[in-house]
């Protein structure tokens, strides 16, 4: 969820967001709250410089009924929930699969307390084909882009755009024979809620710098897997921190939806 990183849907304050329904992605900036429940231990450190890149740390999903955040037991479960989040909103009862005593009456697993960087992402991202990985690399604060997405084929080949994926599939038709489709790939990235995390660029430079102009499959959306040489641990958070307008980030009560969340740390974590 942090490839949460996650699953669930929530209203966005931006009119440009698709249908106003998005996921939340969280990246650890300062450290863990010892009172929070842990799935896997995350050891965090303060950012030593603006160029230090946060790592993805954990996955969470927001209940569509009580709006509390629930930790996901694994990135795989997070991706499973995220893939059909619009059609099947997440509820606390769903978490009984891995936590039998959970309900909306149980306090949230985690709260947003200023120790993590949140970013908005979209639900219903297709899971990568079997044997493939979808990777999200977060860039350091102050850069011109928040993150990069790329895929790793079973052969180990890294693909950084839809064009590269299409060419690779054309050159390796056995994957097409196995049912791999271009619609299973997405290179959209999350959007940080911290306004100054990404350095503003002149409008005339956007088209030449931003590499998201390549065609994106309609069925695919954003977020990420962790690279074999990336580092990961798991944990979670909720959008009620001062400075955030709760009306912007509270799912509409007319239609029950959920929100997904992931967060990370600046530490080097064990390889997956």
Curated annotation (Swiss-Prot):
Q: Which residues bind Zn(2+)?
A: 63, 66, 92, 104
Q: Which organism is it from?
A: Arabidopsis thaliana
- Compositional bias, Polar residues, is annotated for 1-15, 236-250
Pfam families with a match to the protein in the record:
MBD (PF01429), zf-CW (PF07496)
Extract one GO molecular function annotation from the record.
Answer: enzyme binding
Q: Where is the MBD domain?
A: 118-192
Sequence motif MBD-associated domain (MAD), location on chain: 62-104
- Quaternary structure (record): Interacts (via MBD domain) with DDM1.
* Gene Ontology biological process terms from the UniProt entry: chromatin remodeling
Zinc finger map (CW-type): 53-112
User: What gene codes for this chain?
Assistant: MBD2
| Name listed for the protein in its UniProt record | Methyl-CpG-binding domain-containing protein 2
Q: Which domain of life is it from?
A: Eukaryota
Q: Where in the cell is it found?
A: Nucleus
Cite the domain annotation text.
The methyl-CpG-binding domain (MBD) functions both in binding to methylated DNA and in protein interactions.
The organs and tissues expressing this protein are described as: Expressed in buds, flowers, stems, siliques and mature seeds.
Q: Which InterPro entries match?
A: DNA-bd_dom_sf, Methyl_CpG_DNA-bd, Znf_CW
Keywords, sorted A to Z: DNA-binding, Metal-binding, Nucleus, Transcription, Transcription regulation, Zinc, Zinc-finger
């Amino acid at each position: 969820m942090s490839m949460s990183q996650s699953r669930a849907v929530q209203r966005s304050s931006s009119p440009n967001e698709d249908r106003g329904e998005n996921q939340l992605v969280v990246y650890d900036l300062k450290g863990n709250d010892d009172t929070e429940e842990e799935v896997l231990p995350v050891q965090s450190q303060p950012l030593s410089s603006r160029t230090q890149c946060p790592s993805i740390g954990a996955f969470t999903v927001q209940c569509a009924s009580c709006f509390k955040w629930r930790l996901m037991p694994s990135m795989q479960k997070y991706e499973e929930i995220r893939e059909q989040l619009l059609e099947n909103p997440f509820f606390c009862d769903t978490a009984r699969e891995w936590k039998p005593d959970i309900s909306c009456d149980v306090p949230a697993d985690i709260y947003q307390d200023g120790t993590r960087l949140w970013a908005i992402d979209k639900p219903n991202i297709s899971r990568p084909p079997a044997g493939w990985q979808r990777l999200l690399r977060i860039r350091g604060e102050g850069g011109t882009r928040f993150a990069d997405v790329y895929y790793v084929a079973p052969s180990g080949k890294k693909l950084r755009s839809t064009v590269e994926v299409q060419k690779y599939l054309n050159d390796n038709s056995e994957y097409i024979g196995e049912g791999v489709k271009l619609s299973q790939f997405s290179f959209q990235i999350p959007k940080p809620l911290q306004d100054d995390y990404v350095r503003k660029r002149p409008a005339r430079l956007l088209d030449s710098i931003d590499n998201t102009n390549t065609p994106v499959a309609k069925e695919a959306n954003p977020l990420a897997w962790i690279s074999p040489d990336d580092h990961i641990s798991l944990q979670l958070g909720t959008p009620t921190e001062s400075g955030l307008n709760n009306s912007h980030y509270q799912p509409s009560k007319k239609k029950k939806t959920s929100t997904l969340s992931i967060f990370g740390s600046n530490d080097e974590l064990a390889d997956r």
